[in-house]
């Protein structure tokens, strides 16, 4: 029996992963990742880096980050504490859903993860105080390959459920797609 359900979202290749827990009177065991199960779902690149974030303020937003090829990455994002709206934006130049976004509520309670493919930008908004996320990456961080879009860009029309607060200076300064004539990434 697989410990995961892989559910296709409204955007191509972007998947919601529902983790199934084994529960008993002591609590539960839940897998975040299993190389065999993910390979069966078509994800064959190895995990090479794992990051954890803590976002203290409700309404705070991080993102929208991505890495340019050849360091484009798949990310598996899960919430360890609190609740977030996790958002992925399709930035693949030739995609029929170019610049469209999809969001999912992730929480420790719902045991959902978002599997974000290469060619997507990622960000999230904390819906509670003290949110902790864990990210599994198929590429290490390369500052020279870093890219980002502005979370408040009207061209993206992301429907953040709370007022956007506590945006880092760095994230505030990310460009709007129209200001830089953003053409997307080619994988």
Predicted regions and their residues:
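Non-catalytic, conserved peripheral segments adjacent to functional cores
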Residues: 1-109, 130, 137-187
């Amino acid at each position: 029996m697989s410990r995961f359900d892989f559910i296709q979202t409204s955007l191509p290749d972007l998947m919601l992963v529902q983790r199934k827990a084994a529960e008993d009177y002591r609590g539960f065991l839940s897998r975040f990742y299993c190389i065999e199960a993910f390979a069966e779902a078509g994800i064959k690149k190895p995990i090479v880096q794992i990051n954890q974030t803590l976002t203290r303020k409700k309404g705070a937003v991080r993102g929208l980050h991505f890495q340019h090829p050849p360091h484009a990455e798949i990310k598996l994002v899960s919430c360890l504490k609190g609740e977030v709206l996790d958002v992925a934006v399709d930035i693949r130049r030739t995609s029929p859903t170019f610049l469209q976004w999809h969001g999912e509520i992730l929480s420790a309670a719902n045991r959902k993860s978002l599997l974000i493919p290469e060619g997507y930008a990622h960000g999230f908004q904390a819906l509670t105080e003290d949110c902790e996320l864990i990210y599994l990456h198929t590429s290490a961080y390369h500052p020279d390959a870093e890219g980002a879009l502005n979370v408040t860009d009207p061209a993206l029309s992301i429907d953040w459920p709370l007022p956007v607060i506590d945006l880092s200076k760095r994230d505030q300064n990310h460009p709007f797609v129209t200001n830089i004539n953003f053409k997307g990434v080619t994988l």
